[in-house]
Amino acid sequence: KESAAAKFERQHMDPSASSISSSNYCNQMMQSRNLTQDRCKPVNTFVHESLADVQAVCFQKNVACKNGQSNCYQSNSAMHITDCRESGNSDYPNCVYKTTQAEKHIIVACEGNPYVPVHFDASV
């Protein structure tokens, strides 16, 4: 079974893509990372930083998660991210996404030993 940490990497990590020229990025990535298997996932964020830099966020600023849990952490610095948002005219399994790049602080939930990101909570 895929671990929570591995699932986070599959769903949210894309360190190699520092600049995305293609408006098709989300359509391709959401499919290749299996995020459209049983439905069109409405929103997903990819982080274009090294895994080590994202894992380090677990030891940065502790903040409350959206669900009220206390194991979320906000990055000290802004990170290069891409937001993928379902466009509203998807016809599953043909999911259509809008690709938006941003530089924002990320908030992740962490757990386990080693203490690593298991959930992408927000970007601010």
Swiss-Prot record:
Active site residues according to the UniProt entry: H12, H119
EC number: 4.6.1.18
Reactions this protein catalyses: an [RNA] containing cytidine + H2O = an [RNA]-3'-cytidine-3'-phosphate + a 5'-hydroxy-ribonucleotide-3'-[RNA]; an [RNA] containing uridine + H2O = an [RNA]-3'-uridine-3'-phosphate + a 5'-hydroxy-ribonucleotide-3'-[RNA]
Pfam families linked: RnaseA
Localization in the cell: Secreted
Compositionally biased residues, Basic and acidic residues: 1-13
GO CC terms in record: extracellular region
SUPFAM superfamilies for this protein: RNase A-like (SSF54076)
Entry comment describing in which tissues the protein is expressed: Pancreas.
Catalytic EC class: lyase
Entry's Gene Ontology molecular function annotations: lyase activity; nucleic acid binding; ribonuclease A activity
Binding site for substrate: K7, R10, K41, P42, V43, N44, T45, K66, R85
Keywords, ordered alphabetically: Disulfide bond, Endonuclease, Glycoprotein, Hydrolase, Lyase, Nuclease, Secreted
Disulphide bonds in the chain: C26-C84, C40-C95, C58-C110, C65-C72
Annotated spans, Disordered: 1-23
Family annotation (CDD domains): RNase_A_canonical
Top-level lineage group: Eukaryota
Family the UniProt entry places it in: Belongs to the pancreatic ribonuclease family.
Function: Endonuclease that catalyzes the cleavage of RNA on the 3' side of pyrimidine nucleotides. Acts on single-stranded and double-stranded RNA.
Complex and partners: Monomer. Interacts with and forms tight 1:1 complexes with RNH1. Dimerization of two such complexes may occur. Interaction with RNH1 inhibits this protein.
Protein's recorded name: Ribonuclease pancreatic
